[in-house]
Regions:
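Hydrophobic helix-and-loop "lid/oligomerization" segment in the mid-to-C-terminal part
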Residues: 2-21, 29-58, 70, 74-75, ...
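Structural signal for conserved beta-strand scaffold positions within catalytic alpha/beta enzyme cores
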Residues: 49, 80, 102, 117-119, ...
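Short glycine/serine/threonine-rich phosphate/pyrophosphate-binding segments
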Residues: 25-31, 87-89
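Fold-independent oxyanion-binding glycine-rich loops
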Residues: 20, 52-53, 81-84, 103-106, ...
Length: 310
């Protein structure tokens, strides 16, 4: 699996790395980590990263996207990271590349790249890339290791999710050997502004429940406009306020925006991915997302979640 990816990387002098829009720690970590991995082992290659702003994760080193013209894609390899559907890829110009390569740990929803390295047994795309480096004998540098470790930490819920296994800790340990400061990293990841803490309190009071105890939050466009946070902070950031409620196995956050309703689906017990896929989304068995057209459709999704069985 990894050999084919390495040969494709060796083949091209210009490589452009994409990831999903509204990036999380795994998307940014895998993008920066892959760039540093390639530059460390093949210094003669030109490597770019592209996409929308890193937002919450802008503290990560060298994560600012490069501004490149279309002709850079001529005879270039585009690497797509941490993305299962085309609609989520930030910067659609990957289609201009000579060839495409994807690394992902989500359930496959679409054929996107010429070569796919997809394995859902990894807790993160960063974990997959770390194993790729170790198994192919590629060298890491400190920035690559720190970036990849960041993605592993965030996508595993600080190593608490079901996706974590013994391999996760072996890979994390290999990265930690590079000696970066984890205390500083955790402070950047988990110390919040007081406004975010107040926002969590507000959203905790918005929680409602279905007859089968699915927890859910609905934010209308007007409510979103009234809070001091962007749509990603509300959608992805507030879904976690429902995660530690006793007796709640499944929860969902609906955030209405100008372009549709952002849906974040989570469960401790059930596979929510088929529900997300039904509405054009995807992700993992117990953490998926989708964007749907309106709140009426959101109620249909909520009904489907309420009827989940093992």
């Amino acid at each position: 699996m990894f050999k084919q990816a390495l040969e494709l990387i060796k083949k091209y002098d210009t490589i452009i790395i994409h990831r999903h829009t509204n990036p999380d720690g795994d998307a940014i970590g895998s993008q920066v980590g892959m760039k540093e991995l390639i530059k460390t082992n093949f210094p003669q290659k030109t490597v770019y990263i592209v996409g929308d702003d890193a937002k919450r994760f802008s503290f990560m080193e060298d994560c600012s996207p490069d501004n490149i013209p279309n002709n850079v894609y001529d005879n270039a390899l585009a690497i797509i990271l941490d993305t299962s559907v085309r609609s989520m890829i930030s910067d659609g110009r990957y289609t201009l590349a000579k060839e495409t390569l994807r690394f992902d740990h989500h359930i496959k929803c679409e054929d996107i790249a010429d070569v796919d390295i997809i394995d859902t047994s990894y807790e993160s795309c960063c974990g997959l890339i770390t194993d790729f480096a170790l198994q192919t004998g590629l060298k890491l540098n400190v920035l690559a290791a720190k970036s990849l470790f960041t993605g592993m930490v965030t996508d595993s819920g600080r190593f608490r999710y079901d996706s974590v296994n013994a391999r996760t800790f072996r890979l994390a340990a290999a990265l930690k050997e590079y000696g970066f400061d984890t205390n500083k990293l955790y402070a950047n990841l988990y110390a919040d502004d007081f406004e975010i803490i107040k926002l969590r309190a507000i959203y905790t009071l918005k929680i409602k429940f279905t007859k089968n105890n699915v927890a859910y939050i609905i934010t209308t466009k007007d409510e979103l406009a009234a809070v001091k946070a962007d749509e990603f902070t509300v959608s992805r950031g507030m879904v976690g306020v429902m995660s530690e409620i006793k007796g709640v196995d499944t929860w969902v956050n609906f955030t209405e925006t100008e372009s549709g309703v952002l849906c974040e689906l989570r469960s401790k017990r059930y596979n929510v991915n088929p529900v997300a896929a039904k509405y054009g989304g995807g992700g993992h068995a117990k953490a998926s997302g989708a964007t749907i057209k309106d709140l009426e459709t959101a109620m249909d999704m909520l009904k489907d979640l309420d009827e989940l069985k093992e």
